[in-house]
Amino acid sequence: MYRLNAMIFFKELIAFILSAIAGAALCGCAKPGDQPQAGFDTYFPMKLSEKEFQAQLAIEPAEKARGLMFRESLPEDGGMLFAYDIPQKASFWMKNTLIDLDIGFFTADGTLTQVKRMYANNLDSVSSARSDIAYCLEMKAGWFERNGITPPAKLDMPLLKKAVDARKKK
């Protein structure tokens, strides 16, 4: 009996050691400089005209549907940028959104076309006037005005592309 238990223990020990070696070898598979994919909750540095701010990116349909729901606050210079692969007329509502927001609508080249106010928990749709919108930026109500940002202000597209690439990284 003792000999049988010792053999089982020895086999389990060998299996554990081999698993540990294989796991250590797999950890070295990443290329130097590789960064993990950034998640939905990651804030990225952005710039609109000369104003620097931080934004989370909503890229996937579920992220766009969730947006800023259930948030009780936002950082003063923090918001959410919605990115669309195909420019479109953009529409938003404020279901389960607890804070008033402003939304800026942008074309594919990063040009701000308009800013609209959205009110907490208001189910009325707020839509862009144009059908060529590629990005929408939600910030605290009054942020655009406080920072003197009006159409045709421009997003810093290299910074935006870097953030989108970090989110889409496979």
Can you name each region flagged by the protein language model?
Residues A30-K170:
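Compact, glycine-rich, soluble single-domain proteins
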Residues L26-G28:
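C-terminal motif of bacterial Sec signal peptides marking the signal peptidase cleavage site
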